[in-house]
Amino acid sequence: MEPDKKRNRIFVLAIFFSSIYLIWRVFGTIPWTDGVFQAAAGILLVLAEIITTLGMFELMISRMKAKKVIRDLPDVPGEQFPDVDVFIATHNEPAELLYKTVNACTFLEYPDKGKVHIYLCDDGCRREAEELAQRLGVGYLGLSDNRHAKSGNYNNALAHTSSPLIATFDADMIPRREFLMKTVPYFLDPEVKMGLVQTPQSFYNQDLFQFNLFSEKDIPNEQDFFSREVNVMRNASNSAAYTGSNTVILRSALEEIGGFPYGTVTEDFETSLRLQKSGYITYASTEVLAAGLSTTTVESMIRQRVRWARGVIQSIQNTNAIFTRELPASGRLAYLNAYLYWWSFLCRMIFILSPVLFALFGFRLVECGFWELLAFWLPSHLLYGISVRYLSTNVRNMRWSQIIDTILAPYLILPVFLESIGIHQHRFRVTDKKKRKGRTASLRFLIPHGILLALTLASLIRFSYGKYGMALVYSSVILFWLCYNLTGLVYAVFFMLGREAKRKSERIRAEVPVRIRAGKTETAGMKGKKGTTVDVSEEGIAFRLSGGENVEAEEEEHSPVFKGGEKFRIRVLTEHYRAELDAELAYSKQDEKGRIYAASVMPLTEADKRNWLQIIHDREHSLPRELDPWRTVYDDVRQNIFLRRKGEGVWKR
């Protein structure tokens, strides 16, 4: 059987059995006779299951249609490429962060580079930002007294520019050189009313889930599931979202909807929604063409998610997206699911507390027998788990979805509720992405998870105590439920305990040819040892010497060619970039492939610095793109305990 047909049949079976299960739950299991509280709690549990399942149904339907809307990039002659305005939005980000993004934009490939107009859009009117723009030869658009956050900044830029296409980048998002060449042609197909092309959000540093849980080699970035999977699937209903950066937009379409919208803290999401209502296609492509920074503190991550939650709800209410006839039924369903997604965190809390209420306090939330429950629930649950795997190309599974929801749930329930009843947040606060050394622990955020963990453990002990034989069998569903929740809570505790960050800049695995010469030397005519990098960063480099090099200086088989503290010069040469660096050896070590030399580096000139940054960032990042399929809960828990006791985490003394 073809993989797509097999997947679709599993989806159909999952929808069928889940529908039967939900019908049974609604009409046959609510404890109406056990009192008002238990009946209300039972209804909440059923509603939580319905919300979660409907979200899955929408994703399954979109996945079954997704292949129909993966568009081929049109082949367009170079002379047809139009002018493009590149907007880089900044508010208060440091100049060294902006430097990397602006620098990368100056290297963007285009048939006629005179048609690419780059602007640093600064709503802080900072002198350092203006000087940076002048230094790198790009335009500067300052805005004082901005009352409309990012929308106001971009609308000001729109008023001072005129190109038919606009590319937008956040301050930390570094585009690859081919970004425009792989997005602009979509707008040049006369048969397609293209309004916006969104490329995936990608990140070159570890996100907090990867970092705090010591999983940087085992799981992809948490946002990959939406950017690379969900948003692409929503091409099927023309509901792909603008995520604020790494995007190209048609100016005339923006002007038709009145520019970037006000009255929401997620102007990007509402922009794409308004474009869709006006009949334009918003397309989410699949190739990563830019990368930026994930949030580096729990507080900033939570603040970011609260803003997303409130903004999506605001925008859906502002545009009447769920009920408007200006969108197709499939689009309205997608926005209903987008709205309900933010309620899934309340659902997660209900799923955690429901077995606790039963096992610890004796409150019955489901009225049924054991075998009846098993007959209706088990097929639905198993097919649900299998379907999650087929929804994603191994980017997300049911376990990691539960872990992420458990970590975020306590902090999103109240903002989602308040926003839904009309208590709005209008103030925009820029997400802090500054990399810091030191611990990432946030013990005050640990309190809700600590309480839930204690309640779940107490429930497990009380409910299983003194049971054996068939009594344990009849209790197995509740015990499974408690253990399942316990897993997510243990991960949440580890997450909040944090981990010590020892580096200010990210190391990116890369194999790039280098030429090295020990001691002082002139740049011209450098002739020395050849090597290949292992990894690169803004402050350092690790490399191996090529085989067959002259190593007479070695006194024994595995002794280093260069000694610690020795200074030398490195030339790095790629197909597109060339940089010369002063280097100082920090250490060397032996592994199974030979000796690795690690050195701190400093570019010689401004041109070397600009090229060195491109050598580092103009590539696909080296962090995982898929889950490690063999990784288990036992592996993760064991690793977290071992590394924290070893001194890698917050337990270090």
Question: Predicted segments — roles?
Answer:
Residues M1-Q80, A133, F345, Y468-L497, ...:
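N-terminal membrane-anchoring/stem segments of glycan-assembly enzymes
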Residues Y21-I50, V76, Y341-H426, S442-R499, ...:
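Membrane-embedded multi-pass helical conduit in multi-pass membrane proteins
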Residues D83-F87, H117, E270:
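Cell-envelope/extracellular polymer assembly enzymes that use nucleotide-activated donors
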Residues N103-K115:
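Short, acidic, metal-binding catalytic loop of nucleotide-sugar glycosyltransferases
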Residues C121-A129, N146:
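A conserved acidic beta->alpha catalytic loop
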Residues G142-L165, R177-V265, Q276-K277, V298-L340:
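Long helical/loop segments within the catalytic core of UDP-sugar-dependent glycosyltransferases
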Residues D170-I174:
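The conserved acidic donor/metal-binding loop of glycosyltransferases
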Residues T440-R653:
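Structured alpha-helical
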